[in-house]
Amino acid sequence: MEDRIQKAVELFKSGYNCSQSVVAAFADMYGFTQEQALRMSASFGGGIGRMRETCGAACGMFLVAGLETGATEATDREGKAANYALVQELAEEFKKRNGSMICAELLGLKKPEGSSVPEARTEQYYAKRPCAKMVEEAAQIWVEYLEKQMI
């Protein structure tokens, strides 16, 4: 499972957004191709469409949680409740480790950037942003959840 954490970080460092990196690292476990994973998670990067709201890495973790435990019947209240409880547990762990799950807060931004254009991925970009760490944390939290399920 450690290789999945590393894969998520490598995907991010190769240019994929935070959400894509987390989802694509686990997609094959749920029967999705890498292309499908990248497409389904593309909009969540940058705190959802670069709006700096909920961290994209956390969103990716939640998307994978839905693939693992999401209800598939409209009337499955117990299934929905179990999935929501898991998402809340994952969110609490993410916040505990990182102080927040709001992208702008994690980046230390005082106001939204106001652009939909992502920054170029340079050494300076990686040096000033905690995003690779957020991707690693989200993947780590998910791996820890999966490992607990195997016990």
Model-based region annotation:
Residues 1-14:
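Polybasic, low-complexity association/targeting segments
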Residues 12-15, 26, 30, 48, ...:
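Structural signal for hydrophobic packing residues in well-ordered secondary-structure cores
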Residues 16, 44-63:
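Glycine/serine-rich anion-binding loops at beta->alpha junctions
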Residues 25-43, 112-116:
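Acidic-glycine-rich active-site phosphate/pyrophosphate-binding loop
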Residues 29-39, 65-86, 150:
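Phosphate-handling active-site elements
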Residues 52, 78-79, 94-95:
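RNase III-family endoribonuclease catalytic core
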Residues 83-151:
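C-terminal binding/interaction regions
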